C-alpha cells in the first residue's frame, strides 16, 4: 500500500527538521552554558544545542556566542552532555568567541572560589581574569619552545638567606612563607634571586604593585630568561596583552611578571606565586566585586607555593604568620647605620651634610606643594577663606589661595588679630627643598613628585626630595624620613601600616653605612621597630587592638551603598541579627546612603550570600540594586 499523500509544506517542514537534526553534534550534543547577562538574577546555566561544525572545538572552557531572550550575548561552556528527551526545545550555539578551551578548569575553579569570597557576578570576575579577544593575535601567535634551565645560586643570596632556607627554596616543592625584606638590600635584586631559585621547580608568577616595579624586575630578569619571561598587565596594549596571555596559556613560561590583573593567570602544578608588597593600594581592584591580589593568591590550588615579600607586611599577613598558616621568615644584614631622631631637637641637616660627601641623600616628605596649611604668626589661628576653606601658598613668592574655591587673597591679614605674617605648619616638598637649599647652598637638589618623577639619578652626589612612590631607584648614603607625625596619624584605618611600609621600604635603599634620620621621638613604636630592625615589632599589639575593636583582619567589612530609603530599611532588618556589627546609614550625596557591616571571619560567608540574595531580589523587582564591596583598601 502506498504512503498517504502529504501537503508540500508538510514535506518541506520535515526536510528542514531532518536537516536540522543532521547538523546537531552526534556526540554529547548539548552544552551547559553560563550566560553573561547584565541582569543579576538571570545569571545561571542554560542548555544549548551544539552544531556539528562546532562540536570538536566547543569544549569546556570555550566562550561562545548565543541567543538569550531577544539579544545575542556571550556564554561559557561548563559541560557537554547527551540529549535528554525531557529537555525543552533548545537554541543552538551561534559561534565560538574564543579559542577552543581557552579557560582552563583550574582557572574556573579559582574564579568560583573568589566569587564565593567577594560575591557579585561570576562574569565580572571572568572578564577581569581573561583579556579581551584580538583575533589577529591568534593568527600570528608563534610556536616557540621554552627550555627550562637550572641557574647557579649566588653566594650573596646564600649569605643572606642562610644554607637551610636557601636549600628549601631550591628544592622544596611546597612553601608558604611571609618574607620580610632585609634592610640595605635592593628589593629588586632580592626578589629576582628568589624567583631564580624557584624557577627550576616550576613556573614563577611575580605579582607587583605597579609598572615601575615591573620595569625594575624586567631589567634584571629578562637578560637571564629571555623569551622564557612573559609580561602581563593592564599597562600593555590590548593586542600585546592578549598575545602574552595566549603565550602564558599555551607555552607555560618559566617567569611571569604581572601587576594585579595577573592574579588569575593559569599555572602548572608546583608553581610559585610571589606577591610583592601586598599592602600597596594598587593590589586592590576598584571594579565590582572589588577583590585584592593577596586574597586571590591565597585561594589558589594547594599545590602552589605562596611567598609574600614585603618591607613590612599587612596585618592580614601578620595574622596568618601568627597562626602558623604562613611561615615567618626574617633576614638581617650586618649594618652600621647612624640613627638620629626628633628627640632633643636634633636637626637632620647635619646628617645630610655628613652623608652627601659619600653619595646621594634621599629626603622623604609627606606632601607636594609649598605651604599647604599656615597659621597666623601672632595668634596661631588657622588662615581661612570666607567660604570656610583653608588657605595655601603654592610657592615662596605666591600669595595665599583658597584650596576650596580657589579665591586669591592679595593682601592677606589674620581675621582674628590683623597680623599679616604666615606661620607654616604643613610644609610641602617645595618649602622643604627651599630650607635645605639655604643650609646647603652649593649642593644640587632634585625634586621627584607627582607628574615630575625622576626614574634614574644623574651622576654626582645629590639631595633628592621625594613624596611616597616617587623615589628614584638607587642606593643612598643618607635617608631622611620627615613628616613622621603626619604620615603615621593620617585619618585612615591603615595609616600606621602604611607608615611602617613606607619607612622600611626606603630603608632598603640605604647603604650599610648610611645616615638615617627619623622624624619621630625615640620611644615611638615605629622608631623602636626601625632601631630593632624588625618591621613586625608591635604588630601583636596592633592585632590585639584590631580584635577588640572588631576590625580587619579578624572581621570582614562590607560597604553597601544605595538609596536612602532602601539602605535604612535594610539596616533595620539587619540590626536584629546579633552576628553583625552595623555602622550607619551615613548620608553621602543626594538620595544616596552608605552602610558599613562587619562580620567575624567565621560567619562572613553568610553575609556574602545574604547580600547576593538581596541584590538578586532587587533585580527581580526592577529596583536600583545596592553597590556592595567587601574588604576595601580603606573605609
Model-identified regions with their sequence ranges:
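Amphipathic alpha-helical segments in well-structured domains
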Residues: 290-294, 429, 496-500
Amino acid at each position: 500500500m502506498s504512503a498517504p499523500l502529504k501537503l508540500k509544506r508538510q514535506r518541506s517542514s520535515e526536510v528542514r527538521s531532518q536537516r536540522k537534526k543532521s547538523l546537531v553534534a552526534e556526540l554529547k550534543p548539548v552544552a551547559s552554558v553560563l550566560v553573561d547577562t547584565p541582569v543579576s538574577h538571570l545569571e545561571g546555566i542554560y542548555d544549548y544545542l551544539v552544531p556539528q561544525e562546532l562540536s570538536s572545538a566547543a569544549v569546556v572552557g570555550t566562550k561562545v556566542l548565543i541567543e538569550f531572550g531577544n539579544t545575542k550575548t556571550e556564554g561559557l561552556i561548563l559541560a557537554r552532555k547527551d540529549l535528554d528527551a525531557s529537555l525543552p526545545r533548545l537554541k543552538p550555539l551561534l559561534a565560538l568567541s574564543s579559542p577552543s578551551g581557552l579557560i582552563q578548569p583550574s582557572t574556573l575553579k579559582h574564579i568560583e572560589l573568589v566569587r564565593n569570597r567577594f560575591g557579585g557576578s561570576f562574569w565580572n570576575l571572568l572578564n577581569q581574569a581573561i583579556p579581551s579577544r584580538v583575533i589577529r593575535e591568534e593568527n600570528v601567535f608563534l610556536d616557540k619552545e621554552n627550555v627550562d634551565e637550572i641557574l647557579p645560586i649566588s653566594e650573596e643570596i646564600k649569605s643572606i638567606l642562610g644554607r637551610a632556607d636557601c636549600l628549601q627554596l631550591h628544592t622544596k616543592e611546597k612553601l608558604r612563607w611571609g618574607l620580610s625584606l632585609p634592610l640595605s638590600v635592593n628589593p629588586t635584586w632580592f626578589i629576582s634571586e628568589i624567583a631564580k631559585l624557584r624557577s627550576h621547580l616550576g613556573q614563577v608568577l611575580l605579582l607587583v604593585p605597579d609598572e615601575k616595579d615591573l620595569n625594575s624586575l624586567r631589567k634584571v630578569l629578562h637578560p637571564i630568561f629571555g623569551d622564557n619571561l612573559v609580561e602581563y598587565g593592564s599597562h600593555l596594549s590590548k593586542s600585546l596583552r592578549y598575545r602574552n596571555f595566549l603565550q602564558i596559556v599555551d607555552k607555560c613560561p618559566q617567569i611571569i611578571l604581572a601587576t594585579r590583573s595577573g592574579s588569575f593567570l593559569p599555572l602548572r602544578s608546583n608553581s610559585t606565586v610571589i606577591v610583592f608588597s601586598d599592602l600597596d593600594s594598587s593590589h586592590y581592584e576598584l571594579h565590582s566585586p572589588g577583590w585584592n591580589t593577596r586574597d586571590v593568591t591565597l585561594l589558589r590550588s594547594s599545590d602552589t607555593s605562596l611567598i609574600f615579600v614585603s618591607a613590612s607586611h599587612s596585618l592580614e599577613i601578620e595574622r596568618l604568620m601568627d597562626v602558623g598558616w604562613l611561615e615567618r621568615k626574617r633576614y638581617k644584614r650586618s649594618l652600621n647605620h647612624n640613627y638620629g631622631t626628633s628627640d632633643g631637637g636634633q636637626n637632620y641637616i647635619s646628617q645630610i651634610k655628613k652623608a652627601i660627601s659619600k653619595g646621594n641623600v634621599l629626603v622623604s616628605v609627606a606632601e607636594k606643594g609649598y605651604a599647604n596649611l599656615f597659621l597666623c604668626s601672632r595668634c596661631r589661628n588657622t588662615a581661612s577663606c570666607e567660604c570656610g576653606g583653608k588657605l595655601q601658598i603654592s610657592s615662596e613668592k605666591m600669595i595665599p589661595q583658597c584650596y576650596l574655591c580657589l579665591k586669591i587673597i592679595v593682601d592677606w591679614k589674620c581675621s582674628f588679630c590683623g597680623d599679616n605674617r604666615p606661620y607654616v605648619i604643613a610644609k610641602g616638598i617645595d618649602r622643604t627643598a627651599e630650607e635645605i637649599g639655604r643650609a646647603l647652598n652649593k649642593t644640587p637638589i632634585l625634586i621627584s613628585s607627582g607628574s615630575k618623577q625622576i626614574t634614574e639619578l644623574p651622576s654626582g652626589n645629590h639631595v633628592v626630595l621625594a613624596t611616597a612612590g616617587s623615589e628614584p631607584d638607587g642606593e643612598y648614603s643618607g635617608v631622611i624620613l620627615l613628616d613622621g607625625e603626619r604620615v603615621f596619624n593620617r585619618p585612615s584605618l591603615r595609616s600606621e601600616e602604611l607608615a611602617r611600609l613606607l619607612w622600611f621600604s626606603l630603608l632598603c635603599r640605604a647603604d650599610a653605612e648610611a645616615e638615617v634620620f627619623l622624624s619621630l621621638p625615640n620611644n615611638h613604636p615605629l622608631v623602636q621597630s626601625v632601631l630593632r630592625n624588625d618591621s613586625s615589632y608591635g604588630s601583636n599589639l596592633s592585632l590585639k587592638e584590631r580584635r577588640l575593636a572588631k576590625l580587619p583582619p579578624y572581621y570582614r567589612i562590607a560597604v553597601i551603598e544605595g538609596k536612602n530609603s532602601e539602605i535604612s530599611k535594610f539596616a533595620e532588618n539587619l540590626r536584629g541579627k546579633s552576628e553583625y556589627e552595623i555602622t550607619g546609614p551615613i548620608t553621602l550625596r543626594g538620595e544616596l546612603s552608605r552602610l558599613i557591616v562587619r562580620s567575624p571571619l567565621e560567619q562572613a560567608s553568610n553575609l556574602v550570600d545574604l547580600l547576593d540574595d538581596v541584590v538578586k531580589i532587587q533585580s527581580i523587582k526592577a529596583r536600583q540594586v545596592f553597590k556592595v564591596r567587601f574588604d576595601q583598601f580603606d573605609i
